Amino acid sequence: NEGKAKCGNTAGSKLTFKSADECTKTGQK
C-alpha cells in the first residue's frame, strides 16, 4: 500500500485510507 496513507480526523476516532496526495491535502492540518 505504498500509494495509500492513513488519515484521521482531529479527534483521531476515525481512520480512512486515501491516496497520499489526498492525505496531504485533506487529512492533515
Swiss-Prot record:
One of its GO terms (cellular component) is membrane. It is found in: Secreted; Nematocyst; Target cell membrane. Keywords: Cytolysis, Membrane, Nematocyst, Secreted, Target cell membrane, Target membrane. GO terms for biological process: killing of cells of another organism. Circular dichroism reveals that this peptide has random coils and small alpha-helix conformation as main secondary structure. Cytolysin that shows moderate hemolysis and moderate myonecrosis. This is Cytolysin Oshem 1. It comes from Olindias sambaquiensis.
